[in-house]
Amino acid sequence: MDTSLHQEVSTRLAEFNFKPEQSGMLRGGVCPACQKKELYTNADHPWVLRCGRLNNCGEVYHIKDLYPDLFDKWSERYPSTPENKNPHAAADAYLQIGRGFDLAKLRGLYTQEYYYDSKLNIGSATVRFSLGSGYWERLIDQPQRFIKKANFKFGMHYHGSWWKPDQIDLQDVKEIWLVEGIFDVIALMHVGIHAVALMSCNNYPEQALSQLQAACGNQHCTLVWALDGDPAGRNFTKKHVDQARAAGWNCAAAQIPQRGKRAIDWNDAYQRDALTPDHIKTYRYHGALLIAPTREEKALLMYL
């Protein structure tokens, strides 16, 4: 966390009434969920606030969710200047600070561009990723002002395909995770999981799978369907698994259990340090429950 952002965050954290810093930690804050003085965070890097009552509360808050206004003016906070001539300064900051990514892993995958809405007469810097014959871009300057927070190139089609990092050769992997968004792919990449982005839950990547199937021959990998945990994502997970199995693919699934009002995706989990091997095991268990074909198989999974 850079100095200016840390100062602003530290000032606002006073609302939780933490005890004075000890050993680099802030403890004894009032948890917004249970109202107990069990909230704690790292004093130097207060990205995540956690309630210590694991059995009775255990709520987790990312600083972006608590103070979103600190994370929605990237061009203003991190501009390209005569001293810093980086044309991707705002995009770099958004990905590194806002998303928690290691930029060294992302070089060449994105550019900083600009989107202007002529009807609203407003614009925003964007983080743009090439996608097939077009692109997908995320608006990063107060995106709530626009009708959509992200755009595809006008007129392009992506259904039947997917997005993947250029450095990954899918013919050499034993598992491919299929997720909804590009940032989900990048988050999983940071923990050694090879993934592709479908760009929407209803996109079955038939063309991409057919091409991979032809390239791999009989050496099929396992497809791990890891869509969002909302009703649409869960329903399409089951539909896609059925379709992929009918095409000869081995399939599994992974699901993040959802709690509270805010949905948690793979990038959120990464920023909350919730993509450890134990976490992944839990997510795969919930995915297996979701796609279990019979009540008996689901009951067996729960029993084991």
What is each model feature region?
Residues 64-86, 168-172, 290-299:
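Intrinsic-disorder/low-complexity linker and hinge segments
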Residues 60-65, 134-142, 265:
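Short amphipathic beta-strand/extended segments with alternating polar/hydrophobic composition
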Residues 117-219:
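Phosphate-handling DNA/RNA-contact segment within nucleic-acid enzymes
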Residues 1-76, 86-124, 210-213, 224:
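N-terminal structured subdomain of primase-like DNA metabolism proteins
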Residues 1-11, 32, 50-52, 58-60, ...:
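TOPRIM fold recognition
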Residues 46-53, 73-76, 80, 85, ...:
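Short, well-ordered strand-loop elements centered on a beta-strand within folded domains, enriched
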